[in-house]
A protein has these predicted regions:
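Acidic/His/Gly-enriched intrinsically disordered linker/tail segments
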Residues: 95-103, 111, 116-210, 214-215, ...
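Juxtacatalytic substrate-recognition/specificity segment
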Residues: 12-138, 144
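A flexible loop/linker signature enriched in serine peptidases of the S9 family
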Residues: 165, 169, 299-308, 322-327, ...
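Conserved beta-propeller blade repeats
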Residues: 99-102, 144, 280-296, 318-342, ...
Length: 355
């Protein structure tokens, strides 16, 4: 754990630890208040899963990072730990749940997923022989990403007053696609595309996980996570899903999409005239500002990095290509454009700056 921190952070940074019954938290000295808050969340989550399941949840190491300039979190079991980047997102896509609560619910759910996957007989034996490497490989190879991420998004929605599942913006792409009868194969939906607008595995997973819970009950997915990662055949997850539902993964996906299409089409929505260009490659024009007789927009597409464009009567002129953006927001004032980019530290991997 110390090696993980030292290898990527500024050496002079003083660290402290908090230890509870369910977690050992390593944090920068300046982040002690937030570490205490996270410790409380993890203790409550550990108690919740302890009451809900019979799975043994060991004390989990957690590393808090305060020198990164973007919002994220992760779980890995090589070595077994959670990592939090403490700076909250500013774009509102996570809803109004406190950032550290949302992060704790989501990432701790990933931890419990891996623990559930170790519960079947074959995986218990494999874990005893090869440890966390075996768990990492088996879970990663057998359980699709949409199930892992969708289950975590569903959990953050259920265990909080908000969560992404309650944010209208989160499912806007699927609403638009299904209302327009634009559907993709299961393989394309879970793998993504550089040609079409295909929502991420977070969005797909949330819909499929929620559909499974609504139709088959709240505990439906737990047994699939336990048995669907056992390497007793080439497609254990799909086989376990079929055992429970009579449907393959593809059939389950198609049935869920049919359900959501009917549901979304019943919702009220207004039609608007499309003023943007119809392009072959998915493209977004973000936060346009009026400039003289034209517009200044941040253009993002699959075949070009983010750039500022001046748009006049549907004619485009590129102003400037950008680096790694902190977010998509910018300001135009007094003939000057102001935006923020992330600049990585040349020595320390987990340190970066906003310029």
């Amino acid at each position: 754990m110390i090696f993980v921190i030292i290898a990527v952070s500024i050496l002079a940074t003083p660290y402290k630890t908090i230890e509870t019954a369910s977690a050992r938290i390593v944090f920068e000295e300046s982040s002690e208040k937030r570490a205490q808050e996270i410790a409380n969340y993890i203790d409550k989550l550990n108690e919740y899963y302890g009451d809900k399941t019979e799975i043994k949840l060991n004390k989990i190491p957690i590393v808090l990072r305060g020198q990164d300039n973007y919002s994220n979190g992760s779980y890995t079991n090589m070595p077994n730990r959670l990592e939090y980047i403490l700076i909250p997102p500013i774009n509102g896509e996570m809803g109004v749940t406190p950032w550290l609560m949302d992060l704790s619910i989501h990432e701790y759910r990933h931890y419990t997923q891996f623990q559930m996957a170790r519960e079947n007989t074959i995986n218990k034996f494999g874990y005893a022989l090869f440890g966390n490497m075996y768990s990492f490989l088996m879970t990663g190879l057998t359980i699709p990403n949409w199930a892992i991420e969708g289950d975590a998004v569903s959990t953050e929605t259920e265990l909080s007053d908000n969560g992404r599942g309650r944010v209208p913006d989160f499912l806007k792409d699927y609403r638009a696609l299904l209302i327009e009868n634009k559907e993709f194969s299961y393989e394309k939906a879970k793998s993504g595309s550089f040609k079409d607008v295909v929502p991420t595995v977070y969005h797909l997973g949330y819909l499929l996980i929620s559909y499974g819970k609504e139709k088959y009950g709240d505990e439906f997915w737990d047994s699939i996570f336990v048995n669907g990662s056992s390497p007793n055949n080439f497609t254990p997850f799909s086989n376990e899903l079929k055992k429970k539902t009579g449907l393959t993964s593809t059939e389950f996906y198609l049935e869920a999409m049919k359900y959501y299409k009917e549901k979304f089409k019943k919702e009220k929505f207004e039609e608007y005239e499309q003023v943007s260009l119809k392009l072959d490659i998915p493209t977004n024009y973000r936060y346009s500002f009026k400039y003289k007789n034209s517009l200044i927009s941040l253009k993002k597409s699959y075949d070009e990095k983010a750039s500022f464009y001046e748009i006049d009567n549907r004619n485009e002129k590129k102003i400037l290509g950008l680096g790694i953006l902190s977010d998509d927001y910018f300001e135009l004032k007094n003939n000057k454009i102001i935006w923020a980019e992330i600049e990585p530290d040349l020595r320390n991997e987990k340190v970066n700056y906003s310029n």
